Amino acid sequence: DHKGQVMADFVVLKEDNEFFIIIQKDFISIFTGELEIFAKFGSVSFDVCDHKIIGEINKKGDSDNFYYSNDEFELNLHLKKLNYKNKNSINLDMWNAANKILGILHLNKSDSGKFRPLEINFDKQRVSFEKGCFRGQEIVARMKYLGIDRRKFCTFIVQNFLLSIPKYF
């Protein structure tokens, strides 16, 4: 939004000559509401599609078109027809865990408008400071170049047990 808050998270996917926005159903109205005022200037329309979204986790270098990566893995998305059957799959919980391990936070509807991109790692690969412009860019850029990181989304992998915390904490 104009204050630099993240309203929704999504992935832009280009297949052939069409662009698709991969977004949770809860965010569709928020997303279109924020962008409809700009869409009319470019003769752009938003249509809801009912494709299957297939996510892939590949070793680094094995994917042509990935949306996020680290030193070892790449995450990739594809759109398929509804009757597509995937034979080599993981469940949604495993996919979400892979995203969290890579430091990707997927927002819930209740998170809309609570965070700026730098607070949830969107400055790493989701917000470009080199090109384009977006609503709230001045605030976000000022935080990036002049501010101090006060909050950051971090992923910790721990064993499933409780630690004994000393009383002085």
Feature-to-residue mapping (PLM):
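Basic, glycine/lysine-rich polyanion-binding surfaces/domains
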Residues: D1-F169
